[in-house]
Regions:
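Solvent-exposed beta-strand/loop surfaces of large extracellular or lumenal domains
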Residues: 605-625
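Surface-exposed beta-strand/loop patches in extracellular or lumenal glycoproteins
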Residues: 582-598
């Protein structure tokens, strides 16, 4: 048996870093935020896909209201909605036409107020998505800005009569060759027929002109580069406050901010973006002290120093928290249980996107991947020691779900959910609590798929019951926002799923698990993913060692990376979590690493009864030390 050691290097490095002034030499120490964040789980809802109340095939606010009892039973503290404002729907709601009005497809402002009030009555907070960096090109601000240089909104956007360099010219030429160029992400500039200038800066799609927060270091040779204190950028910052204040006035409890770290241009040292958000935080604390700002940033050292309460562990992060679940080299002892058909997973099966093969590191061993992630994650968590929290996500609207590729059985998904739900601050993406499937090659709806990146598979309707529309809507299947996939199929693409389903209905194919991927099928099954998720959330609420401000201490040996073992402790109570995502039995000794965290029962010998057991696993105390044994695809949570 190999001896394990707690990884402390990254933690010590982070602690030393936190002893220095915050980024930008800023001495402010922010409060972490409302108390509910400490033990909370945030539930992300893509509103077009949660529940349709009027039979048009698209989810809406009244549909969510009808499911508040379900959400309360799940045990989450807050719901975060993807954009619900009036949109052009070229990019799934992220091309906003009116920040002050709910899109009619979802209902009215009054419907949202009703949702807030009814959610609050059940102890649930409501957070909205704030797209701070751009608008739709159909937004009235942009339409006026196109006309002249001396109007109210003229400098809300970045305009130029020429492109800055040859690269910009080539990018624009390439983009315009695409028949669907309005949904193309190449380059930073878009050609315009506006009376004032020929080009405007875009953030993502061509229909998403960048709002002008100014340049940290404007180039005098580029007249379109205004300083952050110019009238236009100052007016945009005030507009941002106006939007936040408007919805806080309606009872909303917070915002998740899209692209939060990219608003100010040419800001390499992040000085001006930090100043911008510190200004917002000071204003918010003075006027709305119990509200939450959560960022799409991916670097808590910077994000939390800018005043945010929460930063998110982004799927796009290099050391992403799912990489450890795929063994690209296939260990001699049987390899990862998540390897595809005994062979090497494809890029698409690993990540759901047609990324270039040379962007994927297939040489990294499982141990190296796990250590890379532990170093990264420990550094991030330690950087929150005095300010805010770092959130782990099960998935989201931009990336495939945890049920993807060959990770497609209930036990596999429970291992993954156990990992996320025992992290400091989990964000649970709707449908992941029942194991909803991400399939590639789904229909491209409202700009979900672009440049080889597929997002439709993560946006399919919530599956409530059996049937052709899975209880999401009373419409016919062809009217659904996206198709539903309720069977436990081994298929990895939507066309494969349709072929498999025909064979299944003809009695020629069998599912890989019992029941269906629906709430109805799992509600009364004590072994279901849904009830496992509920149990994990309930355990969090009653166990301060699992709360967001408690420590995360990984235990690791690079010669035997699995089982994954880590401690969560608040100094009074300690949990050990051990997870084996592989296809082989694992046994390790952890005596020295857990000795100081044992409770008064530390002298007891024999089997220790875990708080939670997934599959077959044991924790045994012997005269030679503490031994953890886990069968394939299993895990235990032990209170030390």
């Amino acid at each position: 048996m190999k001896k394990f050691a707690i990884l402390v290097t990254a933690a010590l490095s982070s602690a030393m870093m936190m002893a220095q002034p915050a980024p930008g030499s800023f001495e402010q120490s922010w409060t972490r935020g409302p108390e509910w964040l400490r033990d909370g789980v945030i539930y992300q809802v893509y509103p077009s896909s949660y529940k349709d109340s009027d039979g048009n095939g698209i989810g809406d606010i009244r549909g969510v209201i009808s499911k508040l009892d379900y959400i309360k039973k799940l045990g989450v503290r807050a719901i975060w909605f993807n954009p619900i404002f009036v949109s052009g729907w070229i990019d799934g709601g992220y091309d906003i036409i009116d920040f002050y009005r709910v899109d009619p497809r979802f209902g009215t402002n009054n419907d949202l107020v009703e949702l807030v009030e009814k959610a609050h009555a059940k102890g649930i907070k409501i957070m909205l998505d704030l797209v701070a960096g751009h608008t739709s090109d159909k937004h009235p601000w942009f339409i006026q800005s196109m006309q002249d240089t001396n109007l109210q909104y003229s400098d809300y956007y970045i305009w130029s009569d020429r492109l800055p360099d040859q690269k910009a010219e080539k990018d624009l030429e390439t983009m315009l060759k695409d028949p669907n160029y309005m949904q193309n992400t190449i380059g930073k500039w878009m050609k315009s027929d506006a009376p004032r200038n020929k080009y405007y800066m875009k953030n993502f799609y061509a229909c998403q002109p960048s709002l002008n927060y100014g340049y940290a270091n404007p180039d005098p040779n580029h007249p379109w580069e205004q300083g952050v204190d110019a009238p236009g950028p100052k007016a945009v910052r005030q507009e941002l406050k106006n939007i936040i204040a408007f919805w806080y006035g309606k009872g909303v409890d917070g915002f998740r901010v899209d692209m939060a770290n990219s608003l100010v241009k040419n800001d390499k040292d992040k000085k001006e973006i930090l100043n911008l958000w510190r200004e917002i935080r000071e204003w918010s604390d003075e006027n709305y002290p119990d509200h939450v700002l959560m960022a799409e940033w991916g670097s808590p050292k910077w994000c939390l120093a800018s005043g945010y309460n929460v930063d998110m562990d982004l799927n796009s992060t290099k050391a992403h928290n799912r990489r450890m679940y795929f063994d690209r080299k296939h260990q001699a002892d049987g390899g990862s249980y998540f390897s595809l058909n005994g062979g090497q997973p494809s890029v698409k099966d690993l990540y759901g996107n047609a990324w270039p093969e040379d962007k994927i590191d297939r040489k990294t061993t499982p141990a190296e991947m796990l250590k890379e992630y532990y170093d990264y994650f420990t550094d991030c968590v330690e950087s929150t020691s005095t300010m805010g929290y770092f959130a782990s996500i099960t998935g989201n609207h931009d990336h495939l779900r945890i049920n993807m590729g060959a990770r497609n059985t209930p036990d596999q998904l429970k291992v993954m959910l156990t990992w996320i739900m025992t992290m400091p601050l989990p964000i649970l993406y709707y449908g992941d609590e029942i194991g909803m499937r991400s399939l590639v090659d789904m229909p491209n709806v409202e700009g979900a798929n672009h440049n080889g990146k597929e997002r439709s598979g993560a946006r399919s309707p919530m599956q409530w019951t059996s049937g052709e529309t899975a209880g999401f809507s009373t419409c016919t299947p062809d009217k659904l926002y996206l198709p539903v996939c309720t069977q436990w199929s081994p298929a990895t693409s939507y066309p494969q799923y349709l072929d498999w389903k025909k064979s299944f209905e003809a009695g020629k194919a069998k599912p890989i698990a019992k029941g269906e991927i629906t709430v109805e099928s799992q509600e009364n099954d004590p072994e279901s993913i849904l009830n496992w998720t509920r149990e994990l959330i309930a355990l969090r609420k009653t166990s301060e060692a699992l709360w967001a401000d408690s420590k995360f201490l990984p235990i690791f040996h690079e010669e035997q990376p699995y089982p994954m073992i880590y401690l969560r402790t608040n100094g009074i109570e300690t949990f050990l979590i051990a997870l084996n995502p592989t296809g082989t039995r694992k046994s390790v000794n952890v005596n020295a690493e857990v000795a100081e965290y044992r409770s008064a029962t530390k002298d007891i010998k024999g089997n220790v009864v875990p708080v939670k057991t997934l599959g077959k696993g044991s924790y045994k105390r012997t005269p030679k030390g503490d031994t953890i044994t886990l069968e394939p695809t299993s895990g235990i949570i032990v209170r030390l």
